[in-house]
A protein has these predicted regions:
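Extreme N-terminal basic, low-complexity initiation segments
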Residues: 1-10
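Leucine-biased recognition of intrinsically disordered, low-complexity hydrophobic segments
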Residues: 4-5, 26, 35
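Cysteine-centered motifs
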Residues: 10, 15, 22-24
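Intrinsically disordered, low-complexity segments enriched in serine/proline and basic residues
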Residues: 20, 27-28
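Acidic/His-rich, divalent-metal-binding segments that scaffold phosphate/diphosphate chemistry
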Residues: 30-110
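Divalent metal-dependent catalytic cores for phosphoryl transfer on phosphate-bearing substrates
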Residues: 75-186
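Charged phosphate-binding loop/patch that engages nucleotide di/tri-phosphates or the phosphate backbone
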Residues: 195-212
Length: 212
């Protein structure tokens, strides 16, 4: 009962900020809705700021696409509730990075936001969410990619492996926090991944065949 009350309080706060646009998740009571103030969001983004609003907007975009994949492909047996939570948390580390164009005023390179978020989630005892955070850059990075490109990341394979990790990574690629109003097509998204090499584009197109 205490937990349920806490969720309703969080929902009321969100209503005051977003008005009629708001939606919340109080699974299993509102299983088809998404946005609610997850305890980790309240902990790391306690105030209503442009960054928190952008994070929630982007998270909802990613969640909606991921849940559409769940609906289209019940044969995949995807964990719907986990995907919803993963979409909310996957970018939680962005506040630690230096990307003022999207309201991030930390000190680390933006490329590290995944591993930064993973570190936070491991401190919270959530290895499943840590993996989501660190494995959604591009279509995933290998230790060789990181070493050859001199990326500011640990030299280890950071590849989405479970179906949920792959769906989250795929859904995320259609949206950019620097242009939050846009939704890329499959073709535009494939083009945007060319910076990660031909293998990344190939993997994305394989996902498109599986998930669309």
């Amino acid at each position: 009962m205490v937990i349920l009350l806490a969720y309703f309080i969080c929902f009321a706060e969100y209503c005051m900020v977003y008005g009629a646009r708001c939606r919340c998740v109080l699974a299993p009571f509102f299983n088809q809705s998404f946005l609610f103030m997850h305890p980790f969001i309240l902990k790391y983004y306690p105030e209503d700021t442009p960054l928190r609003r952008l994070l929630l907007h982007h998270s909802e975009q990613v969640a909606n696409r991921a849940l559409q994949i769940c609906d289209r492909h019940p044969e995949l047996g995807l964990n719907r509730d986990f995907l919803r939570e993963a979409a909310l948390i996957h970018d939680i580390g962005i506040f630690l990075t230096d990307a003022p164009g999207i309201h991030c005023h930390g000190t680390s390179p933006y490329l590290t936001h995944g591993v930064q978020g993973a570190a936070l989630m491991r401190k919270e005892g959530r290895e499943d969410l840590a993996r989501i955070c660190e494995r959604h850059t591009g279509t995933g990075l290998t230790a060789e990619n990181i070493r050859q490109q001199g990326l500011p990341l640990p030299e280890s394979d950071l590849l989405p492996e479970t179906l949920e990790e792959q769906v989250l990574c795929y859904a995320d690629k259609f949206y950019s926090k620097s242009h939050p109003e846009r939704e890329r097509t499959v073709e535009q998204t494939a083009k945007s991944l060319e910076m990660f090499g031909a293998e990344g584009v190939k993997k994305f197109l394989t996902w498109a065949e599986l998930f669309e």
